[in-house]
Amino acid sequence: MAKKEVKSSLLDNMIGVGDTVLLEPLNEETFIDNLKKRFDHNEIYTYIGSVVISVNPYRSLPIYSPEKVEDYRNRNFYELSPHIFALSDEAYRSLRDQDKDQCILITGESGAGKTEASKLVMSYVAAVCGKGAEVNQVKEQLLQSTPVLEAFGNAKTVRNDNSSRFGKYMDIEFDFKGDPLGGVISNYLLEKSRVVKQPRGERNFHVFYQLLSGASEELLHKLKLERDFSRYNYLSLDSAKVNGVDDAANFRTVRNAMQIVGFSDPEAESVLEVVAAVLKLGNIEFKPESRMNGLDESKIKDKNELKEICELTSIDQVVLERAFSFRTVEAKQEKVSTTLNVAQAYYARDALAKNLYSRLFSWLVNRINESIKAQTKVRKKVMGVLDIYGFEIFEDNSFEQFIINYCNEKLQQIFIELTLKEEQEEYIREDIEWTHIDYFNNAIICDLIENNTNGILAMLDEECLRPGTVTDETFLEKLNQVCATHQHFESRMSKCSRFLNDTTLPHSCFRIQHYAGKVLYQVEGFVDKNNDLLYRDLSQAMWKAGHALIKSLFPEGNPAKVNLKRPPTAGSQFKASVATLMKNLQTKNPNYIRCIKPNDKKAAHIFSESLVCHQIRYLGLLENVRVRRAGYAFRQAYEPCLERYKMLCKQTWPHWKGPARSGVEVLFNELEIPVEEYSFGRSKIFIRNPRTLFQLEDLRKQRLEDLATLIQKIYRGWKCRTHFLLMKRSQVVIAAWYRRYAQQKRYQQIKSSALVIQSYIRGWKARKILRELKHQKRCKEAATTIAAYWHGTQARKERRRLKDEARNKHAIAVIWAFWLGSKARRELKRLKEEARRKHAVAVIWAYWLGLKVRREYRKFFRANAGKKIYEFTLQRIVQKYLLEMKNKMPSLSPIDKNWPSRPYLFLDSTHKELKRIFHLWRCKKYRDQFTDQQKLIYEEKLEASELFKDKKALYPSSVGQPFQGAYLEINKNPKYKKLKDAIEEKIIIAEVVNKINRANGKSTSRIFLLTNNNLLLADQKSGQIKSEVPLVDVTKVSMSSQNDGFFAVHLKEGSEAASKGDFLFSSDHLIEMATKLYRTTLSQTKQKLNIEISDEFLVQFRQDKVCVKFIQGNQKNGSVPTCKRKNNRLLEVAVP
């Protein structure tokens, strides 16, 4: 028992003060400093009596392991260091053992860790309650309901990556043993305006991003969705990706959680179909169309999105399209139908999307309740966990912040009331004199908001219901008239003159002084958001849907049950929900967790004192401490108190044999503690001043040191004596054992020596006999060897003699043959010399005869005259040829192939050279006429000829078409100003192409832009850039050999641009686009771009390789090529 007490006391090894009730001195500075000191040492939990303060560490800490759960299980609240598990265990044991219904109220601003705190409470309760197959199933369903609700109800905000955008209260039901039976979840005020619009830097609800990131291609195709976030107007793009968040993995977690909770596969698919319909609603756009009566009527621009929504929801397209264009108003038995202008149509679209998602979320909560509710009807114990919005103060505060802060005011009110009530009940229960405590009661603020006569909500409802023109300005005027004199209401236009010159208070705003501080509310949107109107035509269109889930979400659309009453406003609904919640909480024993956000950067190890100070003030933590300390700062049961301090008194140490209260009285009397510093309750000792407790702790610490010294002294003496007696006994035993060992060793030595001597003698005799036998054997072997060597010597001598005889005979034959050969060669040489002399004489004689003849007949030759005649004739022929060529010259057109024929054969080479020189000359003359722009065009045409002539059937039709490049004139069209500003480089091509969808083969119009360094794709409607591909990442362009405009752009594997796969386009200017892409890539990368022309080639779509095959189309397909995705591996293009 002592060991356990020393190990686990709240006051031992304390960093700062674990319970701020004991903080001395108590002020705001010391309170914050205590929290910071504990935060820096990873002590994120601190007590205010039974209230737990939790500071968000923004990182994982090893303090929630199963071992920690066991440490806090069935332990006294103050027995261990502060922890959320201690409060959870206290609440669970009170529910199980004392049959008291519990509620755990978790409050704090957004990002303070409320959602995580609620998860920890539920996980602890699940870990410590009973086991069994049925119990485990209930626990698992309760825990897995959280991921489902977080996916549909949480979103990333600037303050919190997983901010709850709805309030959740869960009643967990237990049986008499403390085992969970089920639960009931209530949700409050889902922030449905986030569906259609999100502030900058924030995201829509998680489920939209999880669905697009984690769903399979088959599911996306079924839901008619694409993975590209930019395709949907309701999704913010600047924060689509969140660091450290894997939306794909979270989607799998949500699907698994839905299955565990009890959703069937058809139900889960129906939910995802509604989510997809909400996403696609945001893509519906309207255009004005004038009617004959002069009024503008809204018409849908592109009905493809509307068609897909109707296919998803099984709604008649005509009915839904009319609901977006007309509004029907019913009054008694009259119906009036009016057209909607474009602004009203957009309002109707957004209202439908918000209502569809909000009702889906409510249906999810009800469906989860059906699965987790208790199946038995026996009496149940209940533990409620409240996780609701924290107090919100933004730069722009609207109706949502007003409602949220109203809820927090009510929670603060019940916190003050229940805290004081609990404190008072404990004093009465312990029979301690009660001291009245003064505190700020925020009931006046709650009354300002909720008063049925002149409260802000009542006036807002009155303004929404009155006939005539109702605007936000008229509502503000009404507030200025009724609330002007209220001390917590401020307005620039009120009758109160002190705010007339307040420049911090705009004319279109009002300010309320909440318990957390002053909040400025923008009045814009209060009336619309409170009305929350959905046109009856849209409700009826939804009720007519063939989709069972959607039909069930809009029961008011049933024409047979038309209700002409105005539906309750959002404010009145929320007020009623809060009243029900407060009534529920007041029936339970409260447990509080106050969550604090240490910084706005969502970073670990950063503690912003100013931010924490602000939260401490509006949470009223110092006031809570003062309430706790108003009577007695510390209280403890008699048994643990006596167990902890009994060593301070000789009468109680080491064991007290009487009642624990008597022991504590003896102890305090012995220590001479003043009587006014403490009081004895029925089961507890109450200490008034923290200094008294710290004095007890100092005395206990000093006494523990003295006891430790005494224990060490006695232990060392006992250890030395024990060691001496052991050594003495050991000496006797060792001597006896040594004598035995010495005799035994001597005997063994003698015995082993005799054995060694015997072994040596036997060995010597054996070796002697062995030597004699070996000598005899060697003698016999030596005689045989000598005889063999002698016979071998005789044989080798005979062999050498025979070889010498044979060698002498061969040498004689060789010498004789060499001499005969030498003689023959000399004779041959003599005969050759004689023959050469005879031939030389004959040659000299012939030359001599020729010389004599030439000398005799030289006077008869006319060599000079013939040469001159030949040269003259040749010159005349050439002159005549050139004069004729001058008169017969062809035209200067480079394509003219005419050329005069040659008159003589010997002029053939000259004729051809002249033709070549003339053609080069006229080509140069032709080129000199062109400007640089014309030269570039002809170079591109020449490049196109080399790439596609006789290879692509489409090429001949492109020869006569000039290459323009900029078909869209982006610089002149104001629609594309944003696109023009986003591109700083020179635009080489600007053309509208059809981008082929990778999933279904359908085409989507895109703007194709080619610059010096990049290839870009932009949305044709908005001009927003969808994809940007550096030219260095383009590896190949593939196309067919037929007369079609399809081509594929292949991207480098592993590059960022290739994450979704290659692109497949269709264009009427294929030849021009491919040629310019080839030349630009060559200029940028110094490498030729591979142009593949084949009727069948492969493209990479994400992780799959898909074959693109060109086939001959049927006549019924018309004259336009069509593209169709056959399966995961084949995409066919039918070419007419």
Swiss-Prot record:
Cysteine pairings via disulfide bonds: none
Cross-referenced SUPFAM superfamilies: P-loop containing nucleoside triphosphate hydrolases
Span list, region Actin-binding: 592-599
GO CC terms in record: actin cytoskeleton; actin filament; apical part of cell; brush border; cell periphery; cytoplasm; early endosome; endosome membrane
Annotated residues for binding of ATP: G108, E109, S110, G111, A112, G113, K114, T115
Record domain IQ: where: 704-729, 730-750, 750-778, 780-807, 808-837, 837-866
Domain TH1, first and last residues per copy: 952-1136
Annotated crosslink Glycyl lysine isopeptide (Lys-Gly) (interchain with G-Cter in SUMO2) location: K287
Myosin motor domain sequence ranges: 15-701
Per UniProt, location of the Glycyl lysine isopeptide (Lys-Gly) (interchain with G-Cter in SUMO1) cross-link in this chain: K287
Keywords: Actin-binding, ATP-binding, Calmodulin-binding, Isopeptide bond, Motor protein, Myosin, Nucleotide-binding, Phosphoprotein, Repeat, Ubl conjugation
Family annotation (InterPro entries): IQ_motif_EF-hand-BS (IPR000048), Kinesin_motor_dom_sf (IPR036961), Myosin_head_motor_dom-like (IPR001609), Myosin_TH1 (IPR010926), MYSc_Myo1 (IPR036072), P-loop_NTPase (IPR027417)
Molecular function as annotated in GO: actin binding; actin filament binding; ATP binding; calmodulin binding; cytoskeletal motor activity; microfilament motor activity; phosphatidylinositol-3,4,5-trisphosphate binding; phosphatidylinositol-4,5-bisphosphate binding
Sequence positions bearing Phosphoserine: S60
Position of the signal peptide: none
GO terms for biological process, alphabetical: actin filament bundle assembly; actin filament organization; actin filament-based movement; endocytosis; nervous system development; post-Golgi vesicle-mediated transport; transferrin transport
Gene3D superfamilies hit by this protein: 1.10.10.820, 1.20.5.190, 1.20.58.530, 6.20.240.20, Kinesin motor domain, Myosin VI head, motor domain, U50 subdomain
Job description of the protein: Motor protein that may participate in process critical to neuronal development and function such as cell migration, neurite outgrowth and vesicular transport.
Similarity comment: family membership: Belongs to the TRAFAC class myosin-kinesin ATPase superfamily. Myosin family.
Name assigned to this protein: Unconventional myosin-Ib
